[in-house]
């Protein structure tokens, strides 16, 4: 190599080494190590998942065996409940039959008693009436007969007197005739019997016999016997069935045992493959993206190096022109430009804004301060850690979404177990209910058949009686005016009571059956509620049998990533603290300037300050002070303000001067006057030819 500066090829060989590319490489390596560690943890989880699956299967088998135990207990409870229900119902029906029998007998006795009372009342009335009338008739008859007997006797006496007179006359005549005439005396011996006759009081004996004969006891007893016989037989049958009834549990079968596979090796393989493939896809996308970004940064850095190479070559010849045009208000600004052209261009852009001069300078200083290499390094560390953590969280969130397959496994297991229990419960409940219905049918047919027959027979008898009675009444009275009256009387006295009895019999007929309670279809599945199933399966997924749980992996890794993000946030806070220091510096500078301005207004200074175009001098200089002498040529000090290049000299310099490679080379190639250090700008008057000769000689000696 003919020179010590770096050529374009040397520059391009290191163009990939930049803060941005190093940041991307750091993120890439950290993300790669993160995914590798995550794959290892997930592999451990998949290896232990089989044990967890077996544990879940054991829990599921226990849950699926529980219906048989519940069914046995339910059958025993149902047996006791049905037997107690049947006994209570049949005992109640037996009591109802007794009550119905007594109601019937009461009605009959009531009806018989009513009519008996009416008949006896009528007979008693007749007897009383006859007795009163008979007594009066007897007295009248006896008196009349006595009077008649007396009248007859008087008449007979008169007749005898007449006959005696006639006999005397006839005897005189007969004596004349020589005949003996003897007329008989008229006598009625029955007159004494008539006088002694009295009307007997035994004429009402028949009525008394009728009264004594009006007695319905035999009819009532016969009716009681006729009515009590079917009721007693029905009641005895019910009591016999009650004492002998027992629910046959041998007919009830046990629930069918079922088996549900909640997870298998294929499922576990599919789940692990799915999660690992998701991690692989995300890692591939992130790595490819980072590699593309690094390649783009490499291309940009290469273009930037080429552009900077050409720019340095061009700026090397125009440097004096820039200095001459006072683009750099301060010589230290030139050094800043050489060290960091991007930062200087940003400051130059800010200076172009329509801001006050002091504010523009302070803003440029603040940007330089917060992006100074130490502060920029802290900001780069913070951003790099933050981006790396965000990428890791994105990967975790995507895997967490993919990990919902594990939750879906538990959920599917939950639905499978729930569906299996529901099917077993429905099948067993239906078969058991059929047996209960069969027992119910036997009870209704065997125990209540006689009650049905009795009530139907009584209803039929009452209907026949009413029809026959109506026919008799119709045939007796026909279309006479008494038909309606008799019908109303019969309706009042008999028909309504018979209709009420028919309603009672109908009610007994309708109620003379039993309805046994049926088992609900969810009797087995409802006993094991959904929360119990889900809690059992979920606890199995996170049981102690599994050394690594899916949620535990995410929790630990997420905590680590969050800690990294917290550290990046701390670095960012540290950079913000540096920004605060910069703001404090800007504020203190502004206060200092304000204080000096106020001080100049209050206390005028007779001396003039020799100042730079922007910053104030560190010490005052009087007006009459002359500048220091021109330093000797061997001190390598040049006047940057008044130096002029000739065109030929620039051409010779272009041929003889080596290309400036770096900002440090540029700083070495162009020595800076000591006046920069002392904050004093020297505007020395020098001869152009001497300066040009010295510059060319110096450069030829160096290169």
UniProtKB/Swiss-Prot annotation:
Any Gene Ontology biological process: plasma membrane fusion involved in cytogamy
Membrane topology (UniProt): Multi-pass membrane protein
A GO cellular component annotation in the UniProt record: plasma membrane
Entry keywords, A to Z: Cell membrane, Conjugation, Glycoprotein, Membrane, Transmembrane, Transmembrane helix
Transmembrane segments: 15-35, 103-123, 286-306, 376-396, 567-587
Record flagged with keyword Disulfide bond: no
UniProt topological domain (Extracellular) ranges: 1-14, 124-285, 397-566
Keyword tRNA processing carried by entry: no
InterPro entries: PRM1
Residues bearing carbohydrate: 142, 185, 196, 221, 244, 256, 423, 430, 453, 459, 470, 510, 530, 542, 545, 566
Cellular compartments annotated: Cell membrane
Residue ranges that the UniProt entry lists as topological domain Cytoplasmic: 36-102, 307-375, 588-703
PANTHER family linked: PLASMA MEMBRANE FUSION PROTEIN PRM1
Entry function: Involved in cell fusion during mating by stabilizing the plasma membrane fusion event.
Record's protein name: Plasma membrane fusion protein prm1
